[in-house]
């Protein structure tokens, strides 16, 4: 046990050195990214727009992550250093009153050992400061040079290397739709690459871009799935459930949330009374059942039923609060991850457009039939009914029928507009295959 506590104590003492080492490694990574950028710089202008924007977004994201790690580690370093300096000063003051030998031991051994580490820490701090200053100058120089080069070609394809949030620049990691089909531009770009002898470097670039898009998209999808669910579940267990139980059982005297629950409880109570009478009659068929015993048993069953519906009302409120937290967390992930969302959008579009025309039409037909097919109203009724029961509302047939009769029609209109407006310009063959399979 003593060895375990000594390990924890030594780990805490090494916190300033560990955080500074993390910041130092991040500054080294910045230098490595800058060296790789020189390789991208040779072919970035001659590459396609998709490759160019994805490379710039990839490098800018990595640099921002490294800078965030550096500043966060330096903050941890300063806080931990201030805390341990305060402890050392306090120990030295106490040792002067109690034991002069303890004071000499600290001043002679510990401080001498700290001097060597302080020199190394100062060197690392100087390196980190120089790396950050050099990064600012480097960003300014390359953003200005690339903006001046691309401004002569087109304004739409200009992508500076400054912070995207400060300049409100929205980028996409895929090629936008233009007057000239993308297949023609890609063919001309590939032909130009073969003539200039840059195919090997561009293949490596495309592979790195594809790997980055896939990893970033999968990571963002995992974030969308697990972060809202995990945060809402932890908040439900640690805060919402204890607080809501205390408030509901202390300050709230109402058991039912709405009339729907009261009707269900009344029907259930009538069934319980009938079952109790039936059991007594079947057991004591020769004797007349006593009304006092029946009233006591019915009273006990009623108390159990009240506890059950009180717990159901509490769970309904708890589910509602948890769903609100889930929606807020999911919205925050969408807002804070706009760049990752653009990468995910480009990755999904690349996967979709890489399919054959038959598979594209099959995917569209499958999605439309699931949402707005002839059998979809029954599925929508089940979904809406389950959602209303989850929120504790009554199963209203009029509301469900109104929703089922209008919402699939809106979805059908949106699908048709998307096919006519967007898909027909990108690939008319997909639209022709879709209509053929649909007929």
Swiss-Prot record:
One Gene Ontology MF term: proton transmembrane transporter activity
Pfam families: CemA
Listed transmembrane segments: 55-75, 79-99, 220-240, 317-337, 364-384, 399-419
Disulphide connectivity of cysteines: none
Catalysed conversion reaction: K(+)(in) + H(+)(out) = K(+)(out) + H(+)(in)
GO cellular component: chloroplast inner membrane
Localization annotation: Plastid, Chloroplast inner membrane
Keyword terms of this UniProt record: Antiport, Chloroplast, Hydrogen ion transport, Ion transport, Membrane, Plastid, Plastid inner membrane, Potassium, Potassium transport, Transmembrane, Transmembrane helix, Transport
Record carries keyword Plastid: yes
Topology class, membrane: Multi-pass membrane protein
PANTHER family to which the protein is assigned, alphabetical: CHLOROPLAST ENVELOPE MEMBRANE PROTEIN, CHLOROPLAST ENVELOPE MEMBRANE PROTEIN-RELATED
Summary of the function given for this chain in its UniProt record: Contributes to K(+)/H(+) antiport activity by supporting proton efflux to control proton extrusion and homeostasis in chloroplasts in a light-dependent manner to modulate photosynthesis. Prevents excessive induction of non-photochemical quenching (NPQ) under continuous-light conditions. Indirectly promotes efficient inorganic carbon uptake into chloroplasts.
Protein name: Potassium/proton antiporter CemA
Gene: cemA
């Amino acid at each position: 046990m003593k060895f375990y506590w000594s390990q924890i104590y030594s780990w805490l003492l090494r916190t300033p050195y560990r955080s500074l080492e993390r910041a130092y490694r991040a500054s080294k990574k910045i230098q490595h990214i800058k060296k790789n950028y020189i390789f991208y710089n040779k072919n970035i202008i001659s590459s396609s727009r998709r490759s160019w924007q994805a490379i710039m977004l990839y490098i800018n994201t990595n640099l921002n992550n490294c800078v965030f790690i550096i500043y966060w580690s330096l903050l941890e370093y300063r806080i931990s250093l201030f805390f341990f300096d305060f402890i050392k000063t306090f120990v030295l003051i106490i040792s002067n009153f109690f034991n002069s030998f303890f004071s000499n031991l600290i001043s002679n051994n510990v401080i001498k050992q700290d001097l060597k580490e302080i020199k190394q820490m100062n060197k690392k701090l100087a390196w980190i400061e120089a790396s950050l200053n050099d990064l600012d100058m480097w960003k300014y120089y390359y953003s200005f040079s690339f903006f001046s080069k691309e401004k002569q070609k087109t304004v739409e394809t200009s992508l500076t290397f400054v912070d995207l949030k400060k300049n409100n620049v929205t980028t996409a990691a895929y090629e936008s739709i233009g007057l000239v089909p993308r297949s023609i531009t890609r063919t001309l770009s590939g032909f130009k690459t073969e003539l200039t002898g840059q195919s090997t470097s561009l293949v490596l670039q495309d592979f790195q871009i594809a790997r980055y898009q896939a990893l970033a998209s999968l990571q963002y999808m995992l974030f969308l799935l697990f972060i809202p669910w995990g945060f809402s579940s932890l908040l439900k267990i640690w805060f919402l459930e204890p607080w809501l139980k205390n408030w509901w059982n202390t300050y709230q005297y109402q058991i039912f949330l709405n009339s729907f629950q009261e009707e269900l409880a009344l029907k259930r109570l009538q069934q319980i009374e009938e079952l109790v009478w039936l059991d007594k009659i079947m057991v004591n068929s020769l004797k007349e059942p006593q009304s006092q015993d029946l009233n006591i048993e019915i009273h006990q069953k009623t108390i159990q039923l009240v506890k059950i519906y009180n717990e159901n009302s509490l769970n309904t409120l708890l589910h509602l609060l948890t769903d609100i937290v889930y929606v807020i967390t999911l919205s925050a992930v969408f807002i804070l991850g706009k760049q990752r969302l653009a990468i995910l959008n480009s990755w999904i579009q690349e996967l979709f457009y890489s399919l054959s025309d038959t598979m594209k039409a099959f995917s569209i037909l499958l999605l439309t039939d699931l949402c707005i097919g002839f059998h979809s109203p029954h599925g929508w009724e089940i979904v809406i009914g389950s959602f209303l029961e989850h929120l504790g509302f009554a199963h209203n047939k009029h509301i469900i029928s109104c929703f089922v009769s209008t919402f699939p029609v809106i979805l059908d209109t949106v699908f048709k507009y998307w096919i006519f407006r967007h898909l027909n310009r990108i690939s008319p063959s997909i639209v022709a295959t879709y209509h053929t399979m649909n007929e």
